[in-house]
Amino acid sequence: MSIGWKEWNRSDIKYGIIVPIIVVLVIAGLSWVSSFLMRSGGMTGSSGIIIGIINTIEELTITVAVPLLLGLVWNRWAGGASGFLMGTVWSMWYAVKYGLYSVFAGGQSARAFNLGPTLLGWVLSAMLIGYMAGALNKHSQNFRRMLIVGIGTTAVGGFFLLGMFQLSPSNVVPFDFYGFVLNVATRIAAGALVAIIAKVFMWYGVNFHKTGTA
């Protein structure tokens, strides 16, 4: 039975309007903070650390959390497709944010930075995480399975991305302990967190369904 146009409640306002607006404002605020720090202090000292943390949070949210969540709660196609889209969006945003496609005074393009493998790695890694999550979880609501899938897929995606970084002539992330922590360990932590969030989403969904049909 479909919902009529007069059937509204507080949850619709809360989760349909307020929460999405808060999320986009937080993202916009983080972007503004990064731009402000870049103009004032650059990438040195405490400003560089803060910019790095913000950049990592944004990257993990877009290229890991979204495709992994859709893969866990929906299916492999939703996870893979969202991973492709989110990875593409992040790659484009990264290129625009750091002016990688600007043109120098002599007419020489900044594409000389040779970050093609890096940008492609973000797209493929996000797509891989989302697709594998859906294929391995298979709509399961068992938390242990979701946690194992979340940790396993993000570890695979992290190692794949780290390997793609090594193919870039302008690679700034070496294949060492630092690179592991930055690309793999952070993704594994995000995978565990997203598994918890996915379980909460499923739990609320099941209870909402039971309440509505009672």
Residue ranges, per PLM feature:
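Alpha-helical transmembrane segments and their helix-start/interface "positive-inside/aromatic belt" motifs
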Residues: D12-V19, L69, N142-L147
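Mid-membrane cores of alpha-helical transmembrane segments in multi-pass membrane proteins
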Residues: T63-V64, S82-G87, W122-A126
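N-terminal signal-anchor transmembrane helix
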Residues: M1-I13, I17
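Central hydrophobic cores of alpha-helical transmembrane segments
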Residues: A78-S91, R145-A155
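Alpha-helical transmembrane segments
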Residues: K14-S31
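Generic transmembrane alpha-helix motif of multi-pass integral membrane proteins
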Residues: N55-G83, M132
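Membrane-embedded alpha-helical hairpins and interfacial helices in multi-pass inner-membrane proteins
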Residues: I3-E7, A28-I57, Y98-S102, G106-A214
